[in-house]
A protein has these predicted regions:
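A short, conserved beta-strand element in the Rossmann-like catalytic core
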Residues: 2, 98, 129
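Alpha/beta-hydrolase
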Residues: 2-89
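Short, glycine/charged-enriched secondary-structure capping and boundary segments
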Residues: 6, 104-107, 134-136
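Catalytic His-Asp charge-relay segment
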Residues: 85-92, 96, 107, 117-120
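Conserved alpha/beta-hydrolase "acid-adjacent" motif
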Residues: 97-103
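Catalytic histidine neighborhood in serine/cysteine hydrolases
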Residues: 112-128
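Catalytic histidine-centered segment of alpha/beta-hydrolase-like enzymes
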Residues: 125-139
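C-terminal alpha-helix
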Residues: 141-149
Length: 149
């Protein structure tokens, strides 16, 4: 499922489940076990009170962020990052297929006005790093960055 209206897309469990493996080398095990993924999928569907009214149950998500990502991948800058003057932490997993090294480098270099900027790539994770065993490293990086403020 992945049908959309002008402003919303409907995303079901069958679409979400395979995403947690995207970018992870084939010879490595899936870092999110089935029990954890089942729990996450249930919480994901519960996040939309209308999910159970559709078959299959699905979550309404705004299309805006997807359009913004597509525009960015197409070379269109959506903001003038040089105007950002606050501390910025860019953090991603080593196998993140959404935020690539090139994307992070481009943003890091564009943040010319940031009072502090840091680019961190965490080993052993992809774009779903927040659900994976290496999420502890993600939390540590965020805590460290925020603790310095």
């Amino acid at each position: 499922m992945g049908s959309s209206t002008e402003t919303l897309a409907l995303i079901d469990e069958a679409v979400q489940r395979p995403r947690q493996r995207t970018g992870i080398p084939e010879d490595l095990p899936t870092p999110v076990d089935e029990v954890e993924l089942d729990r996450w999928c249930a919480a994901y569907l519960a996040s939309d009170a209308t999910a159970s009214q559709r078959t299959p149950p699905s979550v309404r998500i705004p299309n805006g962020p997807s359009a913004d990502v597509a525009a960015s991948w197409g070379g269109q800058s959506l903001v003038d990052s040089a105007l950002i003057q606050i501390p910025v932490l860019i953090v991603r997993g080593e196998w993140d297929h959404v935020t690539t090294d090139e994307d992070a480098r481009r943003l890091f270099n564009a943040l010319r006005g940031a009072s502090d900027k840091r680019d961190v790539k965490i080993s052993g994770g992809n774009h779903w790093l927040h659900l994976q065993p290496r999420r502890v490293a993600l939390w540590a990086e965020v805590r460290s960055f925020l603790g310095e403020r």
